Amino acid sequence: MTEVLFYHLQDMTLENVLPSLLEKSLERGWRVVVQSTSDERADALDAHLWTYRDDSFLPHTTWRARDAEDQPIVLAVEESNPNRANVRFLVDSAPLPEDSGSYERIVLVFNGDDNEALAAARTAWTDCTTRGFEVTYWQADERGRWQRRD
């Protein structure tokens, strides 16, 4: 069964959070697709993942690359799954893909300071529960550690 994790960002940016979530995914041996909503945003995330920390390396590419199928992390703007990922991150209110049930895990990261993003996340939550997915809600505590909320 697909597990869907909703990560509620407040007073933090996707750029601050995404690298560590991707690192944890790679540690677990997962292949990942990160779906954003525009070419420009995917390119900005691509640039950020190369430079976010001097002592780190996240092997990744964009969906345009010829070797996308060989990479553990692919940044995309469409519902394709070029690297046969078992985990899909949805950012910037990217919609749930039609094949959501084919993933082990979907990670929906949304900006809780943006009313439109919050409304889109609520709609996605309802859609996921209707589809019978296991859904969990995560929010950072005052130290920035992710805590599951019930």
Describe the role of every protein-language-model region:
Residues 1-47:
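Long, hydrophobic N-terminal alpha-helical segment
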Residues 9-10, 36-39, 90-94, 111-112:
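Structural motif
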Residues 47-86:
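Helix-adjacent hinge/juxtasegments
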